[in-house]
Amino acid sequence: MESAPKPISRAEGVQSYTYSSTFITGRLMLEKTWRWFGRQDKITLDMLRQIGVEGIVTALHHIPNGEVWSREDIRSMREYIEQHHMRWSVVESLPVCESIKYGGKDRDELIEKYIISLENLGREGVHTICYNFMPVLDWARTDLTHPNGDGTSSLYFSHAEFAYFDCKILKRKGAEAGYTAETLEEVERMSHHFTAEDEHRLVENIIVKTQGFVNGNITEHDERPVEIFRSLLALYDGIDKEQLRANMKYFLEAIMPVCNRWEMNMCVHPDDPPLQILGLPRIVSCDQDIEWMLNAVPDKHNGLTFCAGSLSAGAHNDVPALARKYAGRTHFVHLRSTNVLPGGDFKEASHLGGRAHIIELVRIFQSINPGLPMRVDHAPLMLGDEKMGYNAGYSFHGRMLALGQVEGIMATVDDELGIAPKG
């Protein structure tokens, strides 16, 4: 069997950095990674190395969904990252096509292409793959610049505005049945003063700006995004939670042999938000869902991306309890937090606040499964970020602040655990 080339080690990737949290205690800590959108990203790898990033989370965004990632393309990306003294730590994402999710006629062909891409990644020494099994909508927010009161802004989800989009713009059949009477009353009030500009903003925020850069279903170049979105939703007519689960199990069982051969860790991202939306089934939203997914395919390579932000957006989720339960099957950690407001709206919170309890999460993962790749995920727009045209949620200064906060938490937790050097 052909062996994979030796990828850059974490030690090699941080040799020139004065303070490496990875090795401060002589043992592995959470690896500080950063989601980077390729060479066209305005945030360069040189910038990331200067702020202490050790590993890169990225994808081959130029390859259409469902096409094979060639070994040559993978190697080119890996070597480019390694030239900047970091490593390609996680693929986020190798997209799972909608046809695989709803069980279309071409799913076996698409799964075979997925397997080839996985094998090529394994041959090139890239072994952690974040993906999602959310139908149509990768993640949802209604406001991308919600003011925080200190000059910064964060992502926000309003149930009423989302319901307005569903009932008044998308005009989904039977949509009203999915909302409370209070929410529908608010939708009617909004309909009296919402302008065409307001409606355009909602469309952009919900199905364009948050989607085009992550899965390509709808992009800013599409002239009729609402019509495209309706056609995508129609693909899931008749697909309930049990059928989507069966399709996920089918996919995972098909790819596990190559994952075992090349030690590929698949880590599913939780539903974001972990709530019923648009009548679509959701299968990674709570404790019971995660337990089902891991037990349905009990292979160690079938694991979880522990996204604290997504999970904390559901008031039903006790995030630290989930971390304790599933740390051993977690392959990748997203650290961010949310505040759930009365009525169920939620706002992305500071990494030092909110209901995710990030300090406790670091304690849990450092104690149970140290060495996992971690990224700080979304962060506020601040210090001119809003002028740079960054992808929604992925600011530079906001994430840099969050990374510094989390790095301080990591060092403090190691001191608490009694393993940090004294004096």
Task: Mark where each language-model region is.
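Asp-box/BNR beta-propeller blade signature and adjacent active/binding-site loops
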Residues: 83-87, 116
